[in-house]
């Protein structure tokens, strides 16, 4: 994997739009080269610029309650070919790693609590079927 330049946010610094932008850029740089996630994301996203902008707005809305994101995450992920439930732990692990590289422990934990809740909601929306055991590993 290529070296990813990361400017760390000072632990005493407040969470800002700029810091969220650095997180999004650093995280998706890792996703794009990840052996499991890269093929799925790279085939689904033709132009990374708009996607990164959308993700900055999304995380700004989640963490700063800015209201900048105006999309539907479930609908967006329903259109992604190759998305599988077993990719979520890898996504969460990379996200956690990136948050801990950039932020104080408290801010990283706040991001990760939100990310885990979002992942759980997405998994439920994308993969739950009333006629099957949930979670699927309960079969």
What are these regions (language model features)?
Residues 1-139:
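Core of compact, soluble alpha-helical bundle domains
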């Amino acid at each position: 994997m290529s070296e990813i330049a990361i400017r760390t946010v000072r632990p005493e610094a407040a969470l800002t739009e700029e810091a969220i932008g650095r997180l999004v850029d650093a995280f998706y740089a890792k996703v794009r080269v990840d052996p499991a996630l890269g093929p799925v994301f790279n085939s689904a996203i033709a132009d990374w610029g708009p996607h990164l902008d959308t993700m900055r707005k999304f995380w700004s809305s989640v963490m700063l309650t800015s209201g900048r994101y105006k999309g539907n995450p479930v609908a967006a992920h329903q259109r992604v070919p190759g998305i599988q439930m077993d990719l979520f732990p890898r996504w969460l692990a990379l996200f956690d790693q990136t948050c801990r590289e950039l932020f104080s422990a408290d801010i990283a934990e706040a991001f990760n609590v939100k990310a885990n809740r979002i992942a759980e909601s997405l998994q439920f929306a994308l993969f739950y079927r009333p006629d099957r055991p949930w979670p699927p590993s309960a079969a």
